[in-house]
Amino acid sequence: MSLTNEQIIEAIASKSVSEIVELITAMEEKFGVSAAAAVAAAPAAAAAEEKTEFDVVLANAGANKVAVIKAVRGATGLGLKEAKDLVESAPATLKEGISKPEAEALKKELEDAGAQVEIK
C-alpha cells in the first residue's frame, strides 16, 4: 500500500512536537542527511553574490582643495562652481552605480590630488 503525500502530511500534522523531532532524527539517520544543513546553505548562497555597482564618495577634500576640485571637474564634467560646491560639501557622492575598476581608478585619481575617498 502506497501513501500519498497528503496522507503523509496529515499523519505528521497529527503528531506532537516531540514525536516530530523523533521522526526527523530517524529520517536523518536513515538517509544520512541533516535538516540543519539545508537551512544553513541558503544564507551562504545569498552572501556569495558579489557587488557589481559601486558609489564613489568624497569623504574629505584634504589640504589641497584646488587639485581636488580639478580632479572632480575632470571626473564628473561639472563646472568650476559646481565642483567647488561639491568638494566643500564633503562628504558627498561623486558617482553612483559604476563598475569596480572605474570606481578604483576614480578613487586613486582623487587620492593623488589629496582627497579622502570611500567606495561603497
From Swiss-Prot:
One of its GO terms (biological process) is translation. Keywords: Ribonucleoprotein, Ribosomal protein. Coiled coil: none annotated. It comes from the Bacteria. InterPro entries: Ribosomal_bL12 (IPR000206), Ribosomal_bL12_C (IPR013823), Ribosomal_bL12_C/ClpS-like (IPR014719), Ribosomal_bL12_oligo (IPR008932), Ribosomal_bL12_oligo_N_sf (IPR036235). It holds the Pfam family Ribosomal_L12_N. The keyword Transcription does not apply. One of its GO terms (molecular function) is structural constituent of ribosome. One of its GO terms (cellular component) is cytosolic large ribosomal subunit. The keyword Cell membrane does not apply. Forms part of the ribosomal stalk which helps the ribosome interact with GTP-bound translation factors. Is thus essential for accurate translation. This is Large ribosomal subunit protein bL12. It comes from Haemophilus ducreyi (strain 35000HP / ATCC 700724). The gene is rplL.
